[in-house]
């Protein structure tokens, strides 16, 4: 009898509880239908900065409320630096009144969720869209209460130095993408599937990060800090194997809550889909996280993000191998050469096109979803027709986002570049190398549960 997490997953259980056994605050509660026009209950959507419930719109490409977007824009425009009066840098932001909210902690949270200082152009978010009349009163109330919360006491604020104080902690400048779609109202937009994938993926990513931060590799001293302030340490075989085995159940929950087509498959077919997708997931995510976190500078050009808290240096892959006692030196050198070649290919074929395209978050999400349901992964299988239906829905949504979201009249060139990138990701040689080098242990684990 098959045992293990595939027989015990309950999508209503908080993800952190499933994987690391402590209480969580945000379960995946979205409906499982891929085609439903209603993506989420508005009462369950919260700003990623202040954690208040809001209408689900994006500002600067991030799921934050108008008040926090306005706070961030003003803070950058007038070069404000804040001080936490409690001295903890961990203040509660979802307070009764914004006037009592700690602005230092609010600012740090803005940077943590991915808001980019360089995106503030002309004191206005590049993806700013005029709100409809039904939202005007809400916007006015939010911004008025937010204005008063910035504080005029010198105890709260020092306007003499811009953003360098926090950036010094991060230690390097960061190349970040242009924000995402212009008007992603997730309740009325026709692009329901892409938005649903995006919302569930963000929850999936957050839950995986919680797992990583709980593991012992985070106790290393040799850390660097990306744009989010999350510590990143050198990866080893053992670390990566432990991380992916602990996170595997979260992938199943993400797919089951996002795609009806996956939920309808039997256990063995679900395992097959996961096994096929994991190498491609690493390929896309590692390049995208590198694109988001690593600066475009010569000293970082050999670094590739491996997970959210680890990286591999293509010039020091022996460190990744870890303990090689008892192994033949020629075998070690052969693995080193294959890994170096893999990282170079990933950078040239996937990462560089992302930089050239200045890929947006919804395009990354679309690329991810297309590779879950790629034809080569389902040809001749029971899920072949289901995969075709998902791809049709994704392309319809992508058309809508380009036309009505970004307002691009002639988007054929951009769509073509996206499909070229999709083709590179589908490179069979790269996927098989990733599977053999990075996921050989995971495949054995997957089919043993």
Curated annotation (Swiss-Prot):
Origin species, per record, is: Caenorhabditis elegans
User: Where does the record place Basic and acidic residues bias?
Assistant: 125-142
Q: Name one GO cellular component term.
A: nucleus
Under the heading Pfam families, the entry gives: Hormone_recep, zf-C4
Taxonomically, the superkingdom here is Eukaryota
Q: Name one GO molecular function term.
A: DNA-binding transcription factor activity
- The primary site where this protein sits is nucleus
PANTHER family assigned: NUCLEAR HORMONE RECEPTOR FAMILY MEMBER NHR-43, NUCLEAR HORMONE RECEPTOR FAMILY MEMBER NHR-86-RELATED
**UniProt entry keywords in alphabetical sequence:** DNA-binding, Metal-binding, Nucleus, Receptor, Transcription, Transcription regulation, Zinc, Zinc-finger
Compartments reported by the entry: Nucleus
Protein known as: Nuclear hormone receptor family member nhr-43
Where are zinc fingers of the kind NR C4-type found along the chain? 47-68, 84-105
């Amino acid at each position: 009898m098959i045992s293990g997490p595939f027989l015990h997953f309950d999508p209503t259980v908080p993800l952190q509880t499933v994987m690391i056994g402590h209480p969580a605050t945000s379960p995946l509660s979205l409906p499982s239908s891929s085609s439903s026009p209603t993506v989420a209950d508005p009462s369950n959507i919260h700003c990623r900065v202040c954690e208040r419930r809001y209408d689900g719109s994006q500002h600067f490409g991030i799921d934050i409320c108008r008040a926090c977007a306005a706070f961030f824009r003003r803070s950058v425009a007038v070069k404000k630096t804040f001080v936490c009066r409690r001295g903890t840098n961990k203040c509660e932001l979802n307070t009764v009144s914004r006037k009592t909210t700690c602005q230092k902690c609010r600012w740090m949270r803005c940077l943590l969720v991915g808001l980019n200082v360089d995106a503030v152009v002309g004191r206005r978010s590049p993806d700013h869209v005029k709100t409809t009349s039904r939202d005007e009163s809400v916007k006015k109330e939010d911004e008025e209460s937010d204005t008063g919360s910035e504080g005029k006491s010198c105890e709260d604020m020092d306007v003499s130095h811009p953003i360098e104080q926090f950036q010094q902690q991060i230690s390097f400048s960061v190349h970040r993408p242009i924000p995402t779609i212009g008007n992603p109202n997730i309740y009325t937009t026709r692009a329901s599937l892409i938005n649903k994938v995006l919302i569930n993926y963000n929850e999936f990513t957050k839950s995986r990060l919680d797992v990583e931060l709980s593991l012992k590799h985070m106790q290393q001293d040799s850390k660097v800090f990306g744009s989010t302030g999350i510590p990143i340490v050198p990866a080893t075989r053992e670390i990566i194997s432990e991380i992916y085995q602990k996170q595997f159940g979260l992938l199943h929950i993400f797919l089951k809550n996002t795609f009806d087509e996956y939920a309808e498959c039997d256990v063995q077919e679900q395992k097959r889909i996961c096994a096929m997708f994991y190498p491609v997931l690493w390929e896309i995510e590692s390049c995208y996280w590198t694109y988001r976190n690593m600066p475009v500078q010569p000293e970082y050009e050999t670094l590739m993000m491996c997970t959210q808290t680890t990286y591999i240096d293509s010039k020091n892959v022996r460190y990744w191998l870890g303990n090689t006692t008892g192994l033949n030196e020629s075998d070690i050198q052969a693995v080193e050469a294959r890994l170096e070649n893999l990282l170079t290919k990933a950078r040239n074929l996937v990462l560089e096109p992302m930089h050239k395209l200045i890929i947006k978050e919804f395009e990354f999400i679309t690329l991810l979803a297309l590779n879950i349901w790629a034809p080569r992964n389902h040809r001749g299988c029971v899920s072949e027709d289901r995969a075709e239906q998902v791809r049709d829905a994704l392309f319809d949504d992508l058309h809508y986002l380009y036309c009505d979201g970004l307002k691009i009249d002639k988007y054929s060139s951009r769509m073509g570049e996206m499909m070229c990138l999709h083709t590179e990701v589908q490179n069979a040689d790269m996927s098989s190398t990733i599977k053999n080098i990075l996921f050989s242990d995971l495949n054995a684990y997957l089919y043993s549960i």
